[in-house]
UniProtKB/Swiss-Prot annotation:
Coiled-coil ranges from the UniProt annotation: none
Organism listed in the record: Sulfurovum sp. (strain NBC37-1)
Protein name per Swiss-Prot or TrEMBL: Small ribosomal subunit protein bS18
Gene Ontology CC: cytosolic small ribosomal subunit
Keyword rRNA-binding assigned: yes
Gene: rpsR
Key words of the record: Ribonucleoprotein, Ribosomal protein, RNA-binding, rRNA-binding
Length: 87
């Protein structure tokens, strides 16, 4: 049988700060949940709890609708620091 992956237990940074609402306009907090191609990262990588991961997902989708964050980035256009494109 294959060995099971061992994941380090991460703690939700929003629970530690006692955040009740995640605003879609706060791009500095949302960028930790996005990959370099602006895809939403899963819970096991970010360490968010289920409640806050759902809030982050909704906030990112709202930010995409209002054109604060791009939907996707082409492979050709990926830069070293993609969050320079946001400002």
């Amino acid at each position: 049988m294959a060995e099971r992956r061992k994941f380090k237990k991460r703690f939700c940074k929003y629970c530690e700060q006692k955040v009740d609402f995640i605003d879609y306009k706060d791009l500095n907090s949302l960028k930790f949940s996005l990959s370099e191609r602006f895809k939403i990262m899963p819970r096991r990588l970010t360490g968010n709890c289920k409640r806050h991961q759902e809030m982050v997902t909704v906030a990112i989708k709202r930010a995409r609708q209002t054109a604060l964050i791009p939907y996707i980035v082409d492979r050709k256009n990926v830069v070293e620091n993609p969050f320079e494109l946001i400002k």
